[in-house]
């Protein structure tokens, strides 16, 4: 007897799925970008001390702390030390030409006269890392061949950004600026710069165009450390100078002018112990040496230094951890610090790729639908053995030879680009991008 066929079960869209007939409904936005403020939380910040420009001032003061400055110098140095290059959208000759143009405009590997210094972009990003947000105005000028080329990027410091203006959908529309113009008495107030004319760097953005300072988590440790240092200095002073004592006649009563004068003498000595003291004949002044030893404050300072370093993602020797490494899928062990550096390098590159590169490409290639991208590779290659480096040298030596077997040449060409770079194999596409720019990209006038 033939089995009766089962009726196919009707698929019912579950939570998070969508019926194919409703796919067109995904077009367009229904939810505007909203402010992340609730109760005492204003733009992700609950501490009034750190809200607005008052918070920026706190972060600026933190730069005078040795541990903070040391960590920032290390982070910024590692970010800059990577090998930065522009990767074309494809191996198409036009895409390679566009990438070479961007490479020349950004001044990568070229610090000659007439080139925009690549380090300026890092300087703007460093402000974003410290304060949460920073920007620069993109200024183009006409090149010798009629192309619009990068003249300069005018830094916009976070202290000069009064507010971000948004459109009706909650998207950023313009930056409102104010501040005194350097070299003159002019004061700019309420100047609006369209967002499309800027390159904006945001650190730790949650999607609402509100960055957060990398120093935010280090603030409690910095405040405690600063208060502790003041106590240590005060205690050390008392330990070295002694505790002042003033013996006055029994006839001097509390609340009298003589009593207030006695208090003033002791107070002045505490504030200025090197100054002389004039006393009435029957008054006696002395200092009492402290017999007990001062408490050891080094462990407390070390603890807060370690907390500052951890907040910045730095695994220094002050951070007493036994698990400062993390396993990744290729079997390497990458330190906490290196993971932090890579994350920041990607954050920097993403902003350049999103806010700057398209604005340099489209004025000169209006029909472009794909863009080159800024990317990087780490300077260190300690995880590769000498044998791997030797292999790369051998490949470079034989890959262009006519006598090389076809199978071996095909194998070399099939190597992933990341592996080719790791082995040190010369990348023809990258070399074409890095060729020195010719006179077509020179300026028709001097920069201001």
From Swiss-Prot:
It comes from the Viruses. Keywords: Capsid protein, Viral capsid assembly, Viral genome packaging, Viral release from host cell, Virion. The keyword Cytoplasm does not apply. InterPro entries: P23-45_portal (IPR054117). Its main location: virion. It is found in: Virion. Residues 1-25 are annotated as: Disordered. GO terms for cellular component: viral capsid. Belongs to the P23virus portal protein family. Homododecamer. Interacts with the capsid protein. Interacts with the terminase large subunit; this interaction allows the packaging of viral DNA. This is Portal protein. The lineage of its organism: Viruses, Duplodnaviria, Heunggongvirae, Uroviricota, Caudoviricetes.
């Amino acid at each position: 007897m033939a089995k009766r066929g089962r009726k196919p079960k009707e698929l019912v869209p579950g939570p998070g799925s969508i019926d194919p007939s409703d796919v067109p409904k995904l077009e367009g936005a229904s939810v505007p970008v909203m402010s992340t403020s609730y109760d005492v939380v204003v733009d992700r910040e609950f501490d009034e001390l750190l809200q607005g420009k008052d918070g920026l001032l706190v972060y600026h003061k933190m730069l005078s702390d040795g541990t903070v400055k040391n960590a920032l110098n290390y982070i910024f140095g590692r970010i800059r030390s990577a090998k930065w290059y522009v990767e074309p959208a494809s191996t198409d000759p036009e895409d390679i030409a566009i990438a070479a143009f961007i490479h020349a405009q950004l001044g990568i590997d070229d610090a000659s006269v007439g080139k925009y210094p690549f380090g300026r972009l890092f300087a703007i990003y460093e402000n974003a890392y410290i304060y949460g947000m920073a920007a620069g105005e993109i200024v183009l000028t006409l090149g010798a061949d009629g192309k619009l080329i990068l003249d300069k990027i005018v830094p916009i410091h976070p202290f000069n950004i009064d507010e971000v203006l948004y459109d009706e959908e909650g998207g950023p529309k313009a930056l409102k600026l104010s501040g005194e113009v350097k070299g003159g008495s002019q004061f700019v107030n309420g100047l609006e710069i369209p967002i499309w004319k800027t390159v904006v760097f945001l650190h730790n953005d949650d999607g609402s165009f509100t960055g957060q300072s990398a120093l935010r988590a280090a603030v409690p440790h910095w405040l405690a450390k600063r208060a502790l240092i003041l106590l240590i200095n005060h205690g050390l002073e008392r330990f070295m100078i002694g505790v002042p004592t003033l013996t006055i006649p029994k006839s001097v009563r509390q609340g009298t002018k003589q009593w207030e004068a006695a208090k003033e003498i002791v107070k002045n000595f505490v504030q200025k112990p090197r100054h002389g003291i004039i006393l009435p004949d029957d008054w006696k002044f002395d200092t009492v040496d402290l017999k007990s030893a001062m408490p050891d404050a080094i462990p407390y300072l070390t603890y807060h230094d370690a907390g500052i370093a951890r907040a910045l993602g730095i695994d220094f020797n002050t951070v007493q951890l036994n698990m400062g490494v993390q396993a990744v899928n290729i079997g390497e062990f990458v330190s906490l610090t290196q993971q932090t550096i890579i994350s920041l390098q990607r954050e920097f590159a993403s902003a350049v790729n999103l806010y700057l590169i398209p604005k340099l490409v489209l004025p000169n290639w209006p029909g472009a639908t794909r863009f080159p991208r800024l990317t990087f590779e780490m300077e260190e290659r300690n995880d590769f053995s000498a044998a791997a480096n030797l292999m790369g040298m051998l490949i470079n030596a034989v890959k262009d030879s006519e006598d090389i077997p076809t199978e071996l040449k095909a194998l070399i060409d099939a190597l992933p680009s990341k592996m080719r770079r790791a082995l040190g194999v010369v990348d023809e596409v990258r070399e074409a991008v890095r060729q020195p720019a010719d006179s077509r990209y020179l300026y028709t006038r001097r920069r201001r």
